[in-house]
Regions:
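Structural detector for short beta-strands of small beta-barrel domains
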Residues: 1-13
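C-terminal structural segments of small proteins and small subunits
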Residues: 55-85
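A generic structural motif
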Residues: 10, 14, 31, 78-81
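Short aromatic-glycine-enriched beta-strand elements
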Residues: 18-27
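Short, structured beta-strand/loop micro-motifs enriched in basic residues and often containing a Trp
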Residues: 33-41
């Protein structure tokens, strides 16, 4: 799982059957200081109703259909992050 920030929305008029009815988000992975990382941006399926600038938890999974592919899914909206200094 990765900690990421929602940085945009993706509009797709044609989607595979598994993605129909799903919202797609642009997410950027955050580093340990919760700053966006360069070259770490993905499109993810929104499973929780996340919005722009939300901090989210995302996971990568293998979709098991006729064409196996990897996909990213937003699975939680993060309220707070606590860590030892």
């Amino acid at each position: 799982m990765i900690l990421a920030k929602v940085t945009g929305h993706v509009v797709a008029t044609q989607k595979c059957d598994e993605l129909r009815g799903s919202n797609l988000l642009l997410i950027t992975q955050l580093d340990d200081d919760q700053q966006p990382m360069k070259n770490r941006t993905w499109v993810a399926v929104d499973s929780v109703g996340a919005g722009m600038h939300d901090i989210v938890l995302a996971e990568e999974y293998l979709a098991l259909n006729k064409d196996r592919y990897k996909a990213m899914s937003v699975v939680a909206i993060v309220e707070n992050v606590f860590r030892d200094a």
